[in-house]
């Protein structure tokens, strides 16, 4: 998926700059959203790492603790080209915790460990706190204005390019799989390709709503989501005025679909809009139905929390904010500047 074809909320940026000139320019700290139990058969280990990806560290932890790799879990993937603080979960029923003071892996540091009753699963994460350094910015006045707009109105909640693989290859392979041109046996690859398919369709519908200047306008039959919640309800025609007020106040979010094997969830005008957007996606929709993927909804717009910024000099900006799990920091950066190093990997979830 070409991210340059997606609509901007605040218009295409005038400035360009560099994100992740070095790993220390992209710092991510996981927010579990809960306090560990302090007891139980699982051991939570918080690690600061750079230069190694999540699965590599998980496998190394398994060898260190002398347990099967399947007994080490985590809440989400983090890129190796960044400094990240991430929780890992070791299942140790009836076993003593390993001596983590002797844990040595280049680029990794154990920060703490604590017992937990429940397994840490993919997605069981409240969010991530980001601290970024943007360098070589060409128009700091435009960037400053955009930061003010983002703080007030947010950004499109697009899935970042990482979701689609290098060069969009996950989406290419998903289409080949949909047309029975390739067979996909590995469970992880099937998951990647299905995720890329659904994410691409979400981005497409969200971009079209933005292009029609309807990303904040409630349509009859829209699926509306309480801010910070996953549940949603359908907008009735006789309640549009009241619901619009609640959207304007930030209480409700307008959503777009992550299509599944059931209905999209919208009705009336909103359903017609989404069906029109997906008219050319029949092969991916058929694949998702064939694989019996459960549908979901996701807010079209995202407002970064605790956003703050500091200009180190005229061309260098430090930016910090918090995003809910599954949202992409580079979707925020995309509204600020054009990346000179657009191949820089994304980090989320």
Swiss-Prot record:
One of its GO terms (biological process) is tRNA pseudouridine synthesis. It comes from the Bacteria. Its EC number is 5.4.99.27. It catalyses: uridine(13) in tRNA = pseudouridine(13) in tRNA. One of its GO terms (molecular function) is tRNA pseudouridine(13) synthase activity. Residues 154-302 form the TRUD domain. Pfam families: TruD (PF01142). Keywords: Isomerase, tRNA processing. The active site is at 79 (nucleophile). PROSITE patterns: TRUD, UPF0024. Substrate binds at residues 26, 128, 328. GO terms for cellular component: cytosol. The keyword tRNA processing applies. It is an enzyme of class 5 (isomerase). The keyword Isomerase applies. HAMAP family: TruD. Belongs to the pseudouridine synthase TruD family. Responsible for synthesis of pseudouridine from uracil-13 in transfer RNAs. This is tRNA pseudouridine synthase D. The lineage of its organism: Bacteria, Pseudomonadati, Pseudomonadota, Gammaproteobacteria, Enterobacterales.
